[in-house]
Amino acid sequence: MRYFIFLFVAMLTFSNWASAQQKQEPWAKSQLMETATLASRITNNKTKDLLILSVGPDAIIKGSVDIGPANNQENIKKLNSYLKNVSKDKKIVIYCGCCPFDKCPNIRPAFNTLKEMGFKNAKLLNLPKNIKADWLDKDYPTND
Amino acid sequence: MKRTIFLLLIMLFSGYLFAQNSTLKVGENAPEIALPKVDGTAFSLSSLKGRIVLIDFWATWCAPCVKEQPELKALYEKYANSVKNGKFEILGVSLDKSKENWQKTIERFKIDWLQVSDLKFWKSPVAKDYGIEGLPFNVLIDEQGKIIAINLHGKELEELVHKYLNVEK
């Protein structure tokens, strides 16, 4: 019995800890956009109201704007000035894809900048592994 | 019934074989790499036959790759004699997009081993030829261009390089 109580407490503690870890990310789960969603919007020419910004090594996604790696302060300035006159209601999706989310140095500063600037419809493209595995290998549309 | 199971097993197994075909295997010949160096001159991996070669796939946008460069430098310096005697070489293959970033990082880390890139990012044919799914990634090949090891890093990599260079002396 004691063992079970111990297990129960351990599980509770751990799950709290795990969710606390998740909460530290600047985005909520609902702010992740799935790749299939974006790919189908691009393919069907439904991106007029959407701004796709690359904050990583290369703007490889079709129709995306190359801001540059956001771990560089210069590129954060670039992001700021690019979005200066954009309506705060504009739908924006950012992506990097250099590496898995936990190792990526670019998405956090970029997403935080969007939040600080007050964009209400900012999303992060869900590329859990990288742009190669999660976009190119699926033959989703690219800038050539 | 037995036959069905047997057939199913064969199907499973062939699927496995097929999946394996798309990636590299130890003992196989390393695919040719023919890419330009920083100065734009042509280079091919086959010109390094006769040496143990560490092919380091990296990019300046890959933080763990950049972090590994000083380790590679230490390895290159440790075996400087083998390099001089034509026994060992490192070939850096960059998946960069920006030549400026590539060049700057080479200068910053004073990388003096071979560096090649077509600056095509993930669209570089080498990424496909070597079945690279993510960086950092490397391949160690022997004097005949056969693959000795895939994706070893740190101490494990150094020990293997050491072993091969000593045996061949």
Question: Model regions: which residues?
Answer:
Chain B
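Thiol-/selenol-based redox modules, centered on thioredoxin-like
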Residues: 135, 140-169
